[in-house]
Amino acid sequence: MRREKRLNQGIIKNIAIVVQPHQEISNGPDKKYGGVERVVTFLIEGLLNRNVDVSLYTAKKCSIDCRLIYPMGLFDGEFLEKFNQTQLATYSRKIREDLENKNFDVINNHYDPITFVALQNIRTPTITTLHGPATEENVNTFGGFSECYFSAISQAQKNSYPSNMNFVGDGFVYNSIDDNHPFSDNKRNYLLSVSRLEPIKGQKNAIKIATMCGLDLIIAGNCLDKEYFHEEIRPHLTRDLSKPEKQSERSEFINDISKYQPDVRTIIYVGEVNGHERDQLMKHAKAFLFPIEVEESFGLVLIEAGIAGTPVIAFNRGAIPEIIEQGKTGFFGNTIDDLIGFTKRTSEINSADCREHIKKHFNNEIMVDRYLNLYRTIVAANYA
C-alpha cells in the first residue's frame, strides 16, 4: 500500500521518538532510571508489539529492540550528565538534519525544550509530550508555539499550561505500567518513600508522618541535594545502608523485606534502587508516602505502588486526585495532619482494589492506544 494512502487510512507504521541525550531507554529489572525513561520504554515496547517500526534518537547506550540512531555518536553517562547548552543545541540540530532526510509518519519528542525548538517547521507531523511542570522556562518555550502539537500526561498538567497551546484530542495521555508487576498482600509494618532526595519531594514530611504514627520508614532514592540530606534526613536515620561498605547488608535487607519485623522503630535509607529492588520494597510496604511540595504532573511511582497492592498517602496536589481513588486505593489530603490521620487508616484499603484500579486505568495497552490516536489525529490534519 502506498504511504500516502496508508496514512489517509490512519495506519501508522513508522515513528521517530526523540529523548534527551542522557536518558537511558532500556528494559530490565536492574536498571536505575527515572519516570520518563520508563514511560518511553513502555511506549516503544507497546508500539513494537503493534508492528510499528520505531526509531529512537538518543546519545546513550540503550538496550531495547527498536532502531537506535545516535546523531552525535555514543557517549557514556558521566559525559552526558555534564552536557552543556551548546552541546545540547548541536545534538538537537543533528537530530533535525537526520529527520529531514527520513520519511517518518510521526515524530514524538519527549519534552526537551531545546530539541522542541530545533524541530519547528519540520515537514513530518510532530508532537511533543510534556513530562514536566509548567515552570516559567517551559511556559515561555512551549507557550510561544500555539501551532505546534502537544500532549500532557494528566489533566492537571494540561490545565497548568497556557490555554492557547494546541493540545491534541483530550490533551493528555496518562503514563502507564506493565500490569505483570509483582503484587503482595503480605504487608509489613513499614512506610515507604521512593523519590529523588530533595526538598520538593517531601522526605522531611514523610519522616514526620512516620514518627507521629509510630511506624517505621524506609527511604529510597538518589541523593540530589546533599545539604538537604545532611540537615533534614540524616539526623533522623537509624540505619544508612547507602554507603559502599554496607552493600552486602543492604542487599540482604531488601531481599528479606517480606520478613521485616524490627524490634525498635527505625528510619532506614537504602539509597537509589533499581527496578527489582523498588518492586520488593513497594509490594510489602504498609503504605507509600508521597507528601511532595509541588504540583505533581503525574507521578509514575504512584501507579507502581498501586500495581503492587500498596495504598498511597499523598498531598492533594496536581494530578494526585486523577490517580488515587479516595478511600479505595489510598488517601489524599491538604495538611500533614490530614496525612497522619489517613496513614492510621490504611487497614481500610484492600490491596486487590489498589491493583485492579491501576490495571483498569493505567495499563500499557491503554497508553499505546491513546498515543496511536494522537498520531493518527495529527497525521490526518497534516494530510487534510
Residue ranges and their predicted role:
Residues 2, 22-27, 45-82, 225:
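N-terminal strand-loop element at the rim of the active site
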Residues 125-136, 143-182:
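Donor nucleotide-sugar binding/catalytic pocket of nucleotide-sugar-dependent glycosyltransferases
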Residues 149-151, 168-222:
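Conserved donor-binding/catalytic core segment of Leloir-type glycosyltransferases
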Residues 221, 230-276:
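Nucleotide-activated donor-binding/catalytic signature segment of Leloir-type glycosyltransferases, i.e.
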Residues 311-314:
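Short hydrophobic beta-strand element within catalytic cores of glycosyltransferases
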Residues 316-327, 331-333:
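Short acidic/histidine- and often glycine-rich active-site loop of Leloir-type glycosyltransferases
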Residues 331-352:
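C-terminal "capping" alpha-helix adjacent to the active site of nucleotide-linked donor transferases
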Residues 345-373, 377:
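A short, well-ordered alpha-helix in the C-terminal region of glycosyltransferases
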